[in-house]
């Protein structure tokens, strides 16, 4: 199933990779939308069975490292002053490469978007609702402080590396 964090960020950003990573809900109430589940939630499987499931199967390729990941590593290295590369260019190349790796070729609107992650609202139990943790948009801000730039890089790296998010 899709996690609450993925729902918060991907739906908030209107990120088209959501349709590559997850199947839309089959539950009649939420049909053709994307809904996640907060990790660590005690729930009845019957309540959440119709929510967004992974599109990953036993036969899905599992690359060890992708070119988008390398671009994000280069962006982080540039941000930390370890290379002479431009962190914004590396960041943008990482997002573009991730989109292309997923068969999505319209990237510019996304890269210029100031959309933010949504607060997560649990489908069945509002006691599981959580405020969005991610506080950056996809749009690069060259005036932002180093920590905000790093959060932006790491957020996109995390999205791009799905389903290996723990690696990001």
Predicted regions mapped to residue ranges:
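Extended ligand-binding clefts on enzyme/binding-domain cores
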Residues: 1-71, 78-168
